[in-house]
């Protein structure tokens, strides 16, 4: 498959602001980085000639602690890059704010199921000759102000092109005689990487301005852009005055001439769209929303996925190894899970549940009951995700728990500057206290890859209730599905495609209202929360306790119906066919 699409062996260069490769390696903050890591792992499994570029964050994102009142506090992360990464000898340099900035890199090798190696390069400006300001560019992920962010995005895009050149990876139009590492496609994972197109224009022309339509078209034929943001305010923009300061007036004027600076602000998504031959959203619904935001652009759809082997619980992996020969290299084999006995799936799930509860007791000192129905909610603490919706009517929830025992597991970080997200965590802690001792509720600190795997695999239902249509895709429910954990979710993001009501999970009845004038008057929350309560009380909990075989069927359905499609083996194959192949342009 890969050979037929990439028979000329040209490389794909994948650029992402964050990439999650190891749980304890703080080069990611959330879903974007996790998707990037899963994409690269799948590409390695498929033997795709690919390399990747990101930034090294010496202070990571942040270490989270939550006090008894639910207030989030941020601490500094400390880690040693050499624990996971190997320094490369090659160096590069770029100009930022008129300063020459030296750039070094660290390498991480992903080994696919067939032994194929995919290198990931992390850029680092902690170099002796750099100024303190430039050294700090690779300290914090999503830290600082607009000035800091534009510096980082310049480093990722333009610096990434320079580093790849130093490492021997050159764009297809390069005149180098070495054909072994020619790049046939540059993939921008979100707009943070958009300035790589400026780096390519400079590489193509040898100058910082005066680009012709033909120059832009040459770069456009090499570039692919994936947008993950469903609202205009979520796309990175920077004042043109700041752009002049960081990139230089000549480059800033050229970007204005390219019509990617509406309202005197450099729009990174517009840069990426202008210079890409293929643009996609990350789910069918998200592509529809994106087409309205960018009516001048054709936005295709490639729905996200997860790397099945990475996110499957140990006991479930062993079960799949027993019954599904070849599933690790090709997630499509998960369709044969239809033949796995329900009792074996439930036994493997019980082991995953015990593994989660062991960690909960060690961290929070709370002993959870493995025989009690457990709701899971773990993701970035952002207002639109509504982590506190379950507590909309505490008396109603308590009444349900009086009939059917239940317990709840939460986790998730709020961005340090997101006051609304922080308030959400406070609301969850406050809501948990209001329930009293009848319902055990835990909030686990420092949500990371390993904790994510434990929670998505160890609960009995995965709750997801974002405001529609603000969830571009979401992938945590995909992880739970592969582990036989059904979702109770708003019909948004991937669940629009994945939900077969009462077969693989359940739909929360929730009107779309994100752009309505009565955005948050309480009625919408009441409708959505009542749908959650009603389905828990009338369908889900009675089935779990009184019809365990029927619940087991739902679990198995989620594996063999959702698993074969919502994975990165399928997703990367679609990128190969629709985006990376030069025949797709």
Describe each model-derived feature in a short phrase:
Residues 1-585:
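Catalytic cores of carbohydrate-active enzymes across secretory and cytosolic contexts
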């Amino acid at each position: 498959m890969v050979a037929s699409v990439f028979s000329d062996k040209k490389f794909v260069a994948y650029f992402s602001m964050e990439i999650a490769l190891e749980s304890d390696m703080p080069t990611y903050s959330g879903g974007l980085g996790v998707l990037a890591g899963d994409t690269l792992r799948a590409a390695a499994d498929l033997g795709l000639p690919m390399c990747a570029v990101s930034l090294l964050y010496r202070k990571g994102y942040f270490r989270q602690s939550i006090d008894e009142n639910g207030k989030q506090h941020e601490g500094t992360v400390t880690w040693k890059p050499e624990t996971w990464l190997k320094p490369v000898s090659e160096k590069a340099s770029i100009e930022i704010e008129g300063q020459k900035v030296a750039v070094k890199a660290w390498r991480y090798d992903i080994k696919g199921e067939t032994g194929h190696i995919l290198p990931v390069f992390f850029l680092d400006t902690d170099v002796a000759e750099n100024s303190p300001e430039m050294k700090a560019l690779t300290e914090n992920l999503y830290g600082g102000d607009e000035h800091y962010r534009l510096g980082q995005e310049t480093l990722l895009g333009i610096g990434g092109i320079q580093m790849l050149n130093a490492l021997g990876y050159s764009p297809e139009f390069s005149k180098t005689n070495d054909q072994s590492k020619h790049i046939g496609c540059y993939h921008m994972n979100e707009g943070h990487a958009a300035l790589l197109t400026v780096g390519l224009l400079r590489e193509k022309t040898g100058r910082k301005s005066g680009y012709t339509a033909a120059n832009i078209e040459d770069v456009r034929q090499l570039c692919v852009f994936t947008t993950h943001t469903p609202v205009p305010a979520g796309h990175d923009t920077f004042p043109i005055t700041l752009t002049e300061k960081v990139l230089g007036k000549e480059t800033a004027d050229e970007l204005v001439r390219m019509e990617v600076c509406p309202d005197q602000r450099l729009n990174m998504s517009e840069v990426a769209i202008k210079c890409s031959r293929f643009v996609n959203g990350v789910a069918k619904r998200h592509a529809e929303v994106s087409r309205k935001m960018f009516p001048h652009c054709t936005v295709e759809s490639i729905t996200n996925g997860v790397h099945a082997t990475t996110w499957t619980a140990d006991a479930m992996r062993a079960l799949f190894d027993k019954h599904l020969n070849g599933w690790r290299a090709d997630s499509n084999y998960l369709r044969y899970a239809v033949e796995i006995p329900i009792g074996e799936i439930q036994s493997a799930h019980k082991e995953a549940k015990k593994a989660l509860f062991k960690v909960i007791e060690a961290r929070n000192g709370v002993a959870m009951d493995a025989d009690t129905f457990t709701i899971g909610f773990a993701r970035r603490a952002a207002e639109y995700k509504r982590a506190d919706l379950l507590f909309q009517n505490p008396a109603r929830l308590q009444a349900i728990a009086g009939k059917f025992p239940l317990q709840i597991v939460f986790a998730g970080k709020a961005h340090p500057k997101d006051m609304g997200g922080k308030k959400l965590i406070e609301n969850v802690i406050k809501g948990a206290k209001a329930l009293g001792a009848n319902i055990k509720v835990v909030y686990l600190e420092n949500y990371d890859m390993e904790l994510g795997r434990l929670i998505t695999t160890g609960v009995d239902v995965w709750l997801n209730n974002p405001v529609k249509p603000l969830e571009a895709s979401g992938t945590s429910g995909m992880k739970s599905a592969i582990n036989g954990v059904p979702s109770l979710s708003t019909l948004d993001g991937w669940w629009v495609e994945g939900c077969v009501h009462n077969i693989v999970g359940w739909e929360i009845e929730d009107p779309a209202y994100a752009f309505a004038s009565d955005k948050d008057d309480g009625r919408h929350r009441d409708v959505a929360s009542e749908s959650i309560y009603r389905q828990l009380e009338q369908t889900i909990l009675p089935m779990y306790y009184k019809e365990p075989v029927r619940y087991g069927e739902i679990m198995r359905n989620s594996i063999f119906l959702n698993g074969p499609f919502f994975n990165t083996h399928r997703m990367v194959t679609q990128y190969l066919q629709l985006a990376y192949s030069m025949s797709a342009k």
